[in-house]
Amino acid sequence: TLLYTPPPTAMLLGVALIGYTSAKLDGRFFLPYFVAIVKSADIGAYCLGTLFAKSPMGSHKFVPEISPKKSIEGLIGGVLLSLSVGILGALYLPNVSDAMLILGSNISGNIEVGRIVGAAIISLILCLLSIVGDLVESIWKRDSGIKDSGSYIPGMGGILDVADSLLLAAPFMYAITLTLSRF
C-alpha cells in the first residue's frame, strides 16, 4: 500500500509550492483549503452517519461489501459539510477567494454567483474523490486481510486511514491549482 502514496503526496506539496511560482496564487491558502474540504467530507460522513445509525430510523448501508459502516446518510453528511466548507473558504480565504473570482468569471456572468458555483463544483468533486479514495483503500486492506493499517492514531485505524481520502483528491486539486495559476 505504500506504493500508491508518493505521487499524491508530491502533488500536495505541489499545491503548496505553486504559490512561489505564481504571482496570483498563494499555495499556503490552497493546501489548508484542500485539506479542510476533504477532511470535512470525512467528518460530515462520520457525524451524520453515526447520528442516523443510533436513531430509531437506522441507517442505509452504502457499500456494505467494501466498508460495512458506510451509509448513505453519512455520504450526504460528507457532501453537505464539504460543500459548506468549500464555499465559505472561497468567500473568506483571501487568495482562494481571488482564484474563485477567476473561476467564477468563466462560469457565470455574475462573478459572486460564479465564485460560489465554482467553489461548490470543486468541493463536490473533491468530496467524491475523497470518498472513492477511502473505498479504494478499504478494498486494498480487505484484499490484504488487514483491518487497521496501523496504531499510530488510536481509534482511527492508522495513518493510511487518515490519508486515504486525500490520495485521489490530491491530483485533482493539483491540476486545479496549476490551471488557476496560469490565468
Where are these regions (language model features)?
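Interhelical loop and helix-boundary elements at the membrane-water interface
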Residues: 1-168
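Juxtamembrane boundary at the C-terminal end of a transmembrane helix
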Residues: 175-183
